[in-house]
Amino acid sequence: MLTIALPKGSLLRDSIDRFQQIGLDFSAFLEPKNRQLQILDPTHRAKALLVRAWDVPVYVEYGQAQLGIVGYDILREKKPAVAQLADLNFGGCRLSVAVPQASPYRRSVDLPPHGRVASKFVHCALEHFRRLDLPVEIIPLYGSVELGPITGMSEAIVDLVSTGRTLQENGLMEIEVLFDSSARLIAHPLSYRVNGDRLLDWVEKLRSVI
């Protein structure tokens, strides 16, 4: 039976919609009273696991799920040993550097050497500033990253931006985009080879509805 890791949060509804388009129904996850973390498709052809978005590649990498849907941002940060099969063209956003609107900085390279940057994307942020040959201290924050500059703990943040409204409401502005992100279909590399025809059939169906 096919096992799929689905992400909690903003990508879930569109992920379920894509699978519904190819005949697999996991919409029970969207019911307000649902507490199940694992459900069978009514046709009993597939099973879905509901996990934190950051954990999707872990379940796929360790073989507990053959397929998964996860944001490209997470793949860039975690660098898991998974096969990226398709850009699903939803969940669009970007990873950006942002600073207070009143600050003098207009590019990443303008930040002071050894300045502080708050982010949950620690590796992506480090890679970005290393490319610029600018030494900075990355402060790991995993919620309300915007508070870093607001409280004076950091000069900047590296965070996901969708509409930019949250930044604006907190007096911040984007100064540089690191990369664009969207939902990606991933697979366990060995499962993809061993179960080639069967798994490829599901993958091709998903690609057909992008």
Curated annotation (Swiss-Prot):
It is an enzyme of class 2 (transferase). GO terms for cellular component: cytoplasm. The keyword Nucleotide-binding applies. It catalyses: 1-(5-phospho-beta-D-ribosyl)-ATP + diphosphate = 5-phospho-alpha-D-ribose 1-diphosphate + ATP. One of its GO terms (molecular function) is ATP binding. Keywords: Amino-acid biosynthesis, ATP-binding, Cytoplasm, Glycosyltransferase, Histidine biosynthesis, Nucleotide-binding, Transferase. Its EC number is 2.4.2.17. InterPro entries: ATP_PRibTrfase_cat, ATP_PRibTrfase_CS, ATP_PRibTrfase_HisG, ATP_PRibTrfase_HisG_short. It is found in: Cytoplasm. GO terms for biological process: L-histidine biosynthetic process. It comes from the Bacteria. Pathway: Amino-acid biosynthesis; L-histidine biosynthesis; L-histidine from 5-phospho-alpha-D-ribose 1-diphosphate: step 1/9. It holds the Pfam family HisG. The keyword Ribonucleoprotein does not apply. Belongs to the ATP phosphoribosyltransferase family. Short subfamily. HAMAP family: HisG_Short (MF_01018). Heteromultimer composed of HisG and HisZ subunits. Catalyzes the condensation of ATP and 5-phosphoribose 1-diphosphate to form N'-(5'-phosphoribosyl)-ATP (PR-ATP). Has a crucial role in the pathway because the rate of histidine biosynthesis seems to be controlled primarily by regulation of HisG enzymatic activity. Lacks the C-terminal regulatory region which is replaced by HisZ. This is ATP phosphoribosyltransferase. It comes from Synechocystis sp. (strain ATCC 27184 / PCC 6803 / Kazusa). The gene is hisG.
